[in-house]
C-alpha cells in the first residue's frame, strides 16, 4: 500500500475502534496499526478458503465488528505506530496529560517489526477522551502516533467464570447471533465473536462465558454440532474446570467406562452419533486413566484399539492445567499459519510415560497423532484444529509436571517442513508474547540435545 493510500485508509479507519487488551477483558488486534494491509487473516486466505464455506457464497453476508454488537471501551485507548524505543514508563509520562492512568501495556506487532502498539487504560472516561484529543496525530519520540478508542471485549477473566471456545462459526455470525444461541442457558454471562480488526470481519470463532460450571458443561453438550447459520458448532473448554467438582463429571463422563479404550471418544447422551473429537477433552476419569498401547503409536487417538483386559490402570491423579485467557489464546492462534495443528511440548521428565501425558493433552481437544521421545524429553501432539493446539500451548507454558516446568511452542509436520534458518544457540523453546517458533520435529529434537549437553 502506498503512503497516500495508507493515509486515506487511516482516515477511513479513524473513527473505527480497534481491539483492547487490558487485564480485565481483552481482544488484541490482528495488527498494531489499523491502517496496515497485512493480517494473519489475509495471509491465511489460501488455507482458510476451503474451511470457510460461507465466504464465497453470495447469499451469505459476512458479519462486521461495527454492526455486529461489539461495544467500545470509554476508558481504554489504542495507540498505534509506536516507536519501539518507547517504554511503558515513557509512554505513561506522555499520556498522563489526560489524568491518572490505571494500566499501560505495550505490545509487539508481529506484522510490522518496525513499530509497537499499546493500550492505555484510564480510571475515568473523561481523562481518556482528553488524551485522545490531545495526543492523536502528534509526534511521540520519532513517530506520529495514531490513537483510537478500543473495542471492549465482553469476555470476563474472573476466576468465577467458565469459558467455552466456540469454533467453526460461519462468516455471518456476529456477537448478537452468538449470544442469542447461548443466552437461554442458565447462568449465561456473555458471548462474543473474535474479530479481525483490519477487515472488520469474523475470525471464525468466539467465546461464551457462564458463572456455573454445570451450566457451561450442559451448554457444550447441548450445542456441540448444532447448526448456527449453516455451520455446525465445535465447542471446547477455553479454561479449566474446578478440580473440586471433578467427581461429579467423572460419574457422568468416565472415559474408561463400559470397557472402552482410554483414548476413544465418549458416547454422550446428547451427541450419540456425533463424531466430534473436541468433546473428548474433558471427559476422562483423572484417577482411572489407561495408558496408550505401544502398538497404536502413530494412529489417530480417536481410533485407538481397546487395551488388553490385563492392562493395569494408572492410579496417579493428573492435575488440570490452569485457566487460560481467551485473548492469550487468540494471540497464539495468530502467531502461526492456520494449517499448523501440532503443539510441541518440551522439558518432559524422561520417566514420564504416554499414560501420564495423554490425559493431560486430551484436555485441549481431539488428538489425531501423538509422538513421544522420552530420551529427548519432548513430544508432538497433532490436534484436530489449529485452535486446539493453541489452547494447549498457552495452558501448558511453564506448567509444572512431575517436577519440571513444561516448555511449549508450535510444531510443524515434517512432511510440510520448509527449510528455514537454524535457530541460534540452543535457546529453550518457551512460549512467550514476543515470538512463537514454528519448528520441525528434527530441529526441536536437536535443540533438546543442545540443552542437555
Swiss-Prot record:
Biased composition (Low complexity): 244-262, 434-453
Keywords on record: Acetylation, Cytoplasm, Methylation, Nucleus, Repeat, RNA-binding
Coiled coil: none
The keyword Cell inner membrane appears for this protein: no
UniProt-annotated location(s): Cytoplasm; Nucleus; Cytoplasm, P-body; Cytoplasm, Stress granule
PTM annotation (Omega-N-methylarginine): residues: 260
Gene Ontology BP annotations: cellular response to glucose starvation; nuclear-transcribed mRNA catabolic process, nonsense-mediated decay; regulation of mRNA stability; stress granule assembly; translational termination
A Pfam family recorded for this sequence: RRM_1
The protein's name: Nuclear and cytoplasmic polyadenylated RNA-binding protein PUB1
Source species of the chain: Saccharomyces cerevisiae (strain ATCC 204508 / S288c)
Amino acid at each position: 500500500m502506498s503512503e497516500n493510500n495508507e493515509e486515506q485508509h487511516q482516515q477511513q479507519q479513524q473513527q473505527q475502534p480497534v481491539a483492547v487488551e487490558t487485564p480485565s477483558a481483552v481482544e488484541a488486534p490482528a495488527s498494531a496499526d489499523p491502517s496496515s494491509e497485512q493480517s494473519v487473516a489475509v495471509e491465511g486466505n489460501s488455507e482458510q478458503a476451503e474451511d470457510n464455506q460461507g465466504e464465497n457464497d453470495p447469499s451469505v453476508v459476512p458479519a462486521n465488528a461495527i454492526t455486529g454488537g461489539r461495544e467500545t471501551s470509554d476508558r481504554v485507548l489504542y495507540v498505534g505506530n509506536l516507536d519501539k524505543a518507547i517504554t511503558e514508563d515513557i509512554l505513561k509520562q506522555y499520556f498522563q496529560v489526560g489524568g491518572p492512568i490505571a494500566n499501560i501495556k505495550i505490545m509487539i506487532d508481529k506484522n510490522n517489526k518496525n513499530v509497537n502498539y499499546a493500550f492505555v487504560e484510564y480510571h475515568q472516561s473523561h481523562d481518556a477522551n482528553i488524551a485522545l484529543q490531545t495526543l492523536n496525530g502528534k509526534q511521540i519520540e520519532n513517530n506520529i502516533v495514531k490513537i483510537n478508542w478500543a473495542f471492549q471485549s465482553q469476555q470476563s477473566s474472573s476466576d468465577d467464570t467458565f469459558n467455552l471456545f466456540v469454533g467453526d462459526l460461519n462468516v455471518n455470525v456476529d456477537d448478537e447471533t452468538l449470544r442469542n444461541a447461548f443466552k437461554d442457558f442458565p447462568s449465561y454471562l456473555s458471548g462474543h465473536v473474535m474479530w479481525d480488526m483490519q477487515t472488520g470481519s469474523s475470525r471464525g470463532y468466539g467465546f461464551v462465558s457462564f458463572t456455573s460450571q454445570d451450566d457451561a458443561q450442559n451448554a457444550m453438550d447441548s450445542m456441540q454440532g448444532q447448526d448456527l447459520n449453516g455451520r455446525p458448532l465445535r465447542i471446547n473448554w477455553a479454561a479449566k474446570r474446578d478440580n473440586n467438582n471433578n467427581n461429579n463429571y467423572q460419574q457422568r463422563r468416565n472415559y474408561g467406562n463400559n470397557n472402552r479404550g482410554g483414548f476413544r471418544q465418549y458416547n454422550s447422551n446428547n451427541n450419540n452419533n456425533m463424531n466430534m473429537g473436541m468433546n473428548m477433552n474433558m471427559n476422562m476419569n483423572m484417577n482411572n486413566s489407561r495408558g496408550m498401547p505401544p502398538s497404536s503409536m502413530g494412529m489417530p487417538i480417536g481410533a485407538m484399539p481397546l487395551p488388553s483386559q490385563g492392562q493395569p490402570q494408572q492410579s496417579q491423579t493428573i492435575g488440570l492445567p490452569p485457566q487460560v485467557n481467551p485473548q492469550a489464546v487468540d494471540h497464539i492462534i495468530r502467531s502461526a499459519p492456520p494449517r499448523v495443528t501440532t503443539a510441541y511440548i518440551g522439558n518432559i521428565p524422561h520417566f514420564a510415560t504416554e499414560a501420564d501425558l495423554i490425559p493431560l493433552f486430551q484436555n485441549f481437544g481431539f488428538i489425531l497423532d501423538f509422538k513421544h521421545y522420552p530420551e529427548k524429553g519432548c513430544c508432538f501432539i497433532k490436534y484436530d484444529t489449529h485452535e486446539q493446539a493453541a489452547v494447549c500451548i498457552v495452558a501448558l507454558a511453564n506448567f509444572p509436571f512431575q517436577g519440571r516446568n513444561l516448555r511449549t511452542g508450535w510444531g510443524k509436520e515434517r512432511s510440510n517442513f520448509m527449510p528455514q534458518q537454524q535457530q541460534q544457540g540452543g535457546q529453550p523453546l518457551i512460549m512467550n508474547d514476543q515470538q512463537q517458533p514454528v519448528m520441525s520435529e528434527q530441529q526441536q529434537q536437536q535443540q533438546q540435545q543442545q540443552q542437555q549437553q
